[in-house]
């Protein structure tokens, strides 16, 4: 096994370090992982588990498989062309089409940032009793400060630490409950759509497969500029990137599954429907003990902060891409995009009447924009003019088109059920 890993992943430049070389290249995918363990996911997953038990675990699995294919394709674009998805959209699509696509993606990113900031604010209210609106301002300000003063590598280190805190928190929570693992295992692979579940299913999909993450992943990858280093380096990096994506998305799948399972074993089993994350934390205490609600709130705070940072970075990537530029926090187009995103997110937080419903519907909004981004991604990565010899194969194109069709069908189900 080790020899196989060395052969497949070993570096041609260094002579190969096998499995150790793999670990050195894990990082960009974890920036994406943060985006799908954000507070919007918490709201969607808690709603799914508390209302339908284990029944909707399958959508977490399906969404993660779709996410792996899409994120690998977005990273593929960045590695092969040296352009992120936003830059490539501006460069290769008609101007009015490119601006419309990026404009819709930017609005979806503001919706994302609103969910992240709102979730962090709810956590501050749980921990310190701060009003939600004041918490929104604090979370947005801290996130923007972290972005304005951090390089990619520093941001990666922050985020890996934050993901670790969230993951360990849910391991601790699951250790306190009795899980029906055979039922959970069956639900991971058995699709079902209980009555009234359409909006929750689409919100879980939107919470996992998020359009802003496709822009972010391609930007982080392309900033390393492998495209000018020759075919050997590009092909090597494609292998490393695939492992990074599989590992990172696997971590996200486990954490999202843990959220649904926790809600199913605590709330659904006791007939409690979660309509507020703060209420969810309070409801954990009598069932699992007082420490459980504190662990829940701390994990939510770290999830909110870290995902706010990546949402802001994605916003800056999109606005820079509108001008065919790379993301650079010290550049005017990037910094204005970041600042405007947080201002818009805070403004949305201030007018949302019900924070929990705001989280749920923000995720549904993301899934409505997602087909647009997926179509553009497929169009670009299947073009030999854009990708050269690294253009999508026919089987990969068929897979990506199938993913786009699933997303569109679920969106239609949501719209007809509203």
What role is predicted for each listed range?
Residues 32, 59-91, 101-111:
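Juxtamembrane transmembrane-helix boundary signature
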């Amino acid at each position: 096994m080790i020899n196989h890993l060395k052969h497949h992943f070993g570096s041609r430049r260094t002579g190969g370090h096998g499995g150790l070389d793999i670990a050195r290249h894990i990082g960009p995918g974890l920036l994406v992982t943060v985006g799908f363990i954000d507070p919007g996911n918490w709201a969607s997953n808690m709603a799914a588990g508390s209302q339908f038990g284990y029944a909707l675990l399958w959508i977490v699995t399906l969404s993660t498989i779709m996410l792996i294919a899409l994120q690998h394709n977005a990273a593929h674009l960045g590695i092969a062309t040296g352009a992120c998805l936003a830059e490539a959209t501006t460069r290769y699509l008609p101007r009015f089409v490119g601006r419309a696509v990026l404009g819709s993606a930017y609005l979806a990113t503001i919706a994302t940032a609103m969910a992240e900031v709102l979730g962090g604010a709810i956590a501050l209210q749980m921990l310190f009793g701060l009003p939600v609106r004041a918490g929104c301002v604090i979370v947005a300000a801290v996130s923007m400060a972290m972005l304005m003063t951090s390089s990619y590598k520093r941001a990666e280190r922050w985020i890996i630490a934050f993901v670790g805190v969230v993951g360990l928190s849910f391991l601790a929570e699951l250790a306190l409950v009795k899980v029906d693992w055979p039922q959970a295992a069956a639900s991971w692979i058995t699709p079902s759509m209980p009555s009234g579940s359409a909006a929750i299913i689409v919100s879980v999909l939107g919470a996992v497969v998020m359009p802003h993450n496709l822009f972010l992943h391609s930007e982080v990858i392309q900033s390393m500029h492998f495209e000018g280093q020759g075919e050997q380096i590009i092909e090597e990096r494609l292998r490393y990137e695939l492992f990074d994506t599989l590992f990172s998305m696997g971590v996200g799948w486990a954490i999202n599954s843990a959220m649904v399972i926790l809600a199913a074993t605590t709330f659904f089993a006791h007939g409690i429907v979660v309509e507020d994350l703060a209420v969810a934390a309070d409801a954990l205490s009598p069932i699992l003990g007082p420490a459980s609600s504190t662990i829940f709130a701390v994990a939510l705070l770290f999830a909110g902060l870290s995902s706010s940072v990546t949402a802001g970075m994605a916003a800056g990537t999109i606005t820079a891409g509108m001008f065919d530029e790379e993301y650079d926090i010290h550049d005017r187009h990037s910094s204005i995009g970041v600042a405007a995103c947080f201002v818009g997110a805070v403004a949305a937080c201030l007018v949302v009447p019900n924070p929990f419903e705001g989280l749920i519907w923000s995720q549904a909004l993301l899934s409505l924009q997602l087909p647009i981004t997926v179509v553009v991604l497929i169009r670009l990565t299947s073009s030999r003019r854009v990708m050269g010899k690294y253009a999508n194969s026919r089987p990969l194109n068929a897979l990506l088109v199938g993913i786009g069709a699933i997303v569109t069908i679920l969106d239609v189900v949501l719209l007809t059920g509203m």
